[in-house]
């Protein structure tokens, strides 16, 4: 009688032993490699990536945006590097990016097409750089943008065309720049804006500040910030808070052209409009002169005549008047 045989279960047991830890090995291999070169093909090689689409490339002294960006990226941290300029298509391939951090890079140049393809971007941080100007259309592709920080740059002027129409933008940080006023029409293209950070700028309290003050009356700043948004000129208004100015304070400022007037200028053209304006001025001056002359004539007609002088003055040359009976001419006539 043969004893029990274990030859048949052994292959099955070995197979179970080999297969049982496989999910653990797979999980370890997928999560233990932080860089793109070790198990994360959608991550730039020099960066550290974590599940959820976050790529951290902070403080690596990078001179440019690293290659290898993919559609799986949701957040890209490039702060504290040396990215001095953003060329066209700098973030090609990252069309699903929602957050982009470019703080403290010494950035001084942004190409007008640098952000093309980032239609899903919601947060853009360009603070603490060296930007002095932004080309028209720079942010035009960012239709989903909700938070934009330009704080701590060297911006002396911000044109409406640079921001473009950002219908979802809710927060705009402009503090610590060199802004004396905001260009007319800039805030009007940001219908969802409800947080505007302005402190640390040399605001000039003149007529150019009227649109900003009107916006601040509709969207009051927090008390802590309202006390720090101050005028630096003219002298009599130095250190006056912007929130203290009512619309009556700008009553001496010329009103901008209405839409109807702008439509007339556009239809006629600049040259034709100037000719028409000169003709209207000449016609108005002529009518005013005619009315003044008519008024003088009417006043003269209503004035009573002067009575005759009973004692006329003698002729200044010593000659007798023809009506004087003692004159030689009167004697000859007699």
Swiss-Prot record:
Glycans are attached at residue 147. GO terms for biological process: positive regulation of voltage-gated potassium channel activity; potassium ion transmembrane transport. Residues 1-26 form the signal peptide. Residues 27-261 are extracellular. Disulfide bonds join 43-49, 47-57, 205-231, 207-253. Residues 304-313 have a biased composition (Pro residues). Isoform 1 is expressed highly in normal prostate and salivary gland, very weakly in colon, pancreas, and intestine, and not at all in other tissues. Isoform 1 is expressed highly in many cancer cell lines and in breast cancer, pancreatic cancer and colon cancer. Isoform 2 is expressed in cancer cell lines. SMART domains: LRR_TYP (SM00369). It is a single-pass type I membrane protein. The chain crosses the membrane at residues 262-282. Residues 298-334 are annotated as: Disordered. Residues 283-334 are cytoplasmic. Residues 320-334 have a biased composition (Low complexity). Keywords: Cell membrane, Cytoplasm, Cytoskeleton, Disulfide bond, Glycoprotein, Ion channel, Ion transport, Leucine-rich repeat, Membrane, Repeat, Signal, Transmembrane, Transmembrane helix, Transport. Pfam families: LRR_8. It comes from the Eukaryota. One of its GO terms (cellular component) is cytoskeleton. It is found in: Cell membrane; Cytoplasm, Cytoskeleton. Residues 34-71 form the LRRNT domain. Interacts with KCNMA1. Auxiliary protein of the large-conductance, voltage and calcium-activated potassium channel (BK alpha). Required for the conversion of BK alpha channels from a high-voltage to a low-voltage activated channel type in non-excitable cells. These are characterized by negative membrane voltages and constant low levels of calcium. This is Leucine-rich repeat-containing protein 26. It comes from Homo sapiens.
């Amino acid at each position: 009688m043969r004893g029990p045989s274990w030859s048949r279960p052994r292959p099955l047991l070995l197979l179970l032993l080999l297969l049982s830890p496989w999910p653990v090995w797979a999980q370890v291999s997928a999560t233990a490699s932080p860089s793109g070169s070790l198990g994360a093909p959608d991550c730039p090689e020099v960066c550290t990536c974590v599940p959820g689409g976050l790529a951290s490339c902070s403080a690596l002294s990078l001179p440019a945006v690293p290659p290898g960006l993919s559609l799986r990226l949701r957040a890209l941290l490039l702060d504290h590097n040396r990215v001095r300029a953003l060329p066209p298509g700098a973030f090609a391939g990252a069309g699903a990016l929602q957050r982009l951090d470019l703080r403290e890079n010494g950035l001084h140049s942004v190409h007008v097409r640098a952000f093309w393809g980032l239609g899903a971007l919601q947060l853009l941080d360009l603070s603490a750089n060296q930007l002095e100007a932004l080309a028209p259309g720079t942010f035009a592709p960012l239709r989903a943008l909700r938070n934009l920080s330009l704080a701590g740059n060297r911006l002396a002027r911000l044109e409406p065309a640079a921001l473009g129409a950002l219908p979802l933008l809710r927060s705009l940080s402009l503090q610590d720049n060199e802004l004396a006023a905001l260009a007319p029409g800039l805030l009007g293209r940001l219908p969802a804006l409800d947080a505007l950070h302005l402190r640390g700028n040399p605001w000039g309290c003149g007529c150019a500040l009227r649109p900003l003050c009107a916006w601040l009356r509709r969207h009051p700043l927090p008390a802590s910030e309202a006390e720090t948004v101050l005028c630096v000129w003219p002298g009599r208004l130095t250190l006056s808070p912007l929130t203290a100015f009512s619309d009556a304070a700008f009553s001496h400022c010329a009103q901008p052209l209405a839409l109807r007037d702008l439509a007339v200028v556009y239809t006629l053209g600049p040259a034709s409009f100037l000719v028409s304006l000169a003709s209207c001025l000449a016609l108005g001056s002529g009518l005013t002169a005619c009315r003044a002359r008519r008024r003088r004539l009417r006043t003269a007609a209503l004035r009573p005549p002067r009575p005759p002088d009973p004692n006329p003055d003698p002729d200044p040359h010593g000659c007798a008047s023809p009506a004087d009976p003692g004159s030689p001419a009167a004697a000859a006539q007699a």
